[in-house]
């Protein structure tokens, strides 16, 4: 049976319906249980990272290799024609799209990934993060991890902590979890880094419960998922960063009273917001979460590049 994601651009988590999300997650579970090293054997995929990345780039490229695809691309735009000669993004994408079957792209400018789709022809573009906007594949691995650990994606209590203003992962994850029934959100952030109003308005329109809090301990006993984020130094002026970086820090002692199966997630990199003593607790699940990126991204690549995927 033909799949609905074949040759589809994946720019925002809103490009995926609830059924699409379930399809990706089911495919990820199958690939985790049964690797397919030749599934993309004759495909060439561009890995175009105009912004620094460790986990996302390596996870995507590992996913490509483990499915048998050939990988071309760059991890620093400074050494490309765009960086050195002033070539436009439109021209860069127009050329790259003639070489490959799909483009995975990260860019510091919000909206850059959507712009790329206007110049990629029939070649699908997968957004690996555009500024503070969207990071849909991080959301897919987050959903996969939540489903694995909690056994469901509905009727969950989810707390999000830290930089909720610039943290694109929490924007995408909230929008995705809002597609499922009965979820409740707790947002814990300084006023300067509060969740954007458009996200809160979206939750209100859907009748989804949410609340604002000033400390992690206010909600610890209530939540199934505690999603920590770092304060993004690169998106703040130095004085603002100094004021807020240490405001929300999770320590092992803070986990007293947490639900037995509560999991602490983090998109990484971690700086100071989770102390290392948390790593030794059964609640810490951020490294397993990062590992799940392989399977979530494999699933998305497999679906986007196969019209009839049977695993």
From Swiss-Prot:
Asked if Ligase is a keyword of the record, the answer is no
Q: For carbamoyl phosphate, which residues are the binding ones?
A: 55-56, 106, 135, 138, 268-269
EC id: 2.1.3.2
Q: Which UniProt keywords apply?
A: Pyrimidine biosynthesis, Transferase
Q: Where does L-aspartate bind?
A: 85, 168, 230
What Gene Ontology cellular-component terms does the record carry?
cytosol
- What pathway does this protein act in? Pyrimidine metabolism; UMP biosynthesis via de novo pathway; (S)-dihydroorotate from bicarbonate: step 2/3
The record's PANTHER family line, in alphabetical order, gives: ASPARTATE CARBAMOYLTRANSFERASE, ORNITHINE CARBAMOYLTRANSFERASE, MITOCHONDRIAL
Q: What is this protein called?
A: Aspartate carbamoyltransferase catalytic subunit
The organism encoding this protein is Citrobacter koseri (strain ATCC BAA-895 / CDC 4225-83 / SGSC4696)
Gene name of the record:
pyrB
């Amino acid at each position: 049976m033909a799949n609905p994601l074949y040759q589809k651009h994946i720019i925002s988590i809103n490009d995926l319906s609830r059924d699409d999300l379930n399809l990706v997650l089911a495919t990820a579970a199958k690939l985790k249980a049964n690797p397919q090293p030749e599934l993309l054997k004759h495909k060439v995929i561009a890995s175009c990272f105009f912004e620094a990345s460790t986990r996302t780039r390596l996870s995507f490229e590992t996913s490509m290799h483990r499915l048998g695809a050939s990988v071309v691309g760059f991890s620093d735009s400074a050494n490309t024609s765009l960086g050195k000669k002033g070539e436009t993004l439109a021209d860069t994408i127009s050329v790259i799209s003639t070489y490959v079957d799909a483009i995975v792209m990260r860019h510091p400018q919000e909206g850059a990934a959507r712009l790329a789709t206007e110049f990629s022809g029939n070649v699908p573009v997968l957004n690996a993060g555009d500024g503070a906007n969207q990071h849909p594949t991080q959301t897919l691995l987050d959903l996969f991890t939540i489903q694995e650990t909690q056994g469901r994606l509905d009727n969950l209590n989810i707390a999000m902590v830290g930089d909720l203003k610039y943290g694109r992962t929490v924007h995408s994850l909230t929008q995705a979890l809002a597609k499922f029934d009965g979820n409740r959100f707790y947002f814990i952030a300084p006023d300067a880094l509060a969740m954007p109003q458009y996200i809160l308005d979206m939750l209100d329109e859907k009748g989804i419960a949410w609340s604002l809090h000033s400390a992690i301990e206010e909600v610890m006993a209530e939540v199934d998922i505690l999603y920590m984020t770092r304060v993004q130094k690169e998106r703040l002026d130095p004085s603002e960063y100094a004021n807020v970086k240490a405001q929300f820090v999770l320590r092992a002692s803070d986990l007293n009273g947490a639900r037995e199966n509560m999991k602490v997630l983090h998109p990484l990199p971690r700086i100071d917001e989770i102390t290392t003593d948390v790593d030794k607790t059964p609640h810490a699940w951020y490294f397993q979460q990062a590992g799940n990126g392989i399977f979530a991204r494999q699933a998305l690549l497999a679906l986007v590049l196969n019209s009839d995927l049977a695993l």
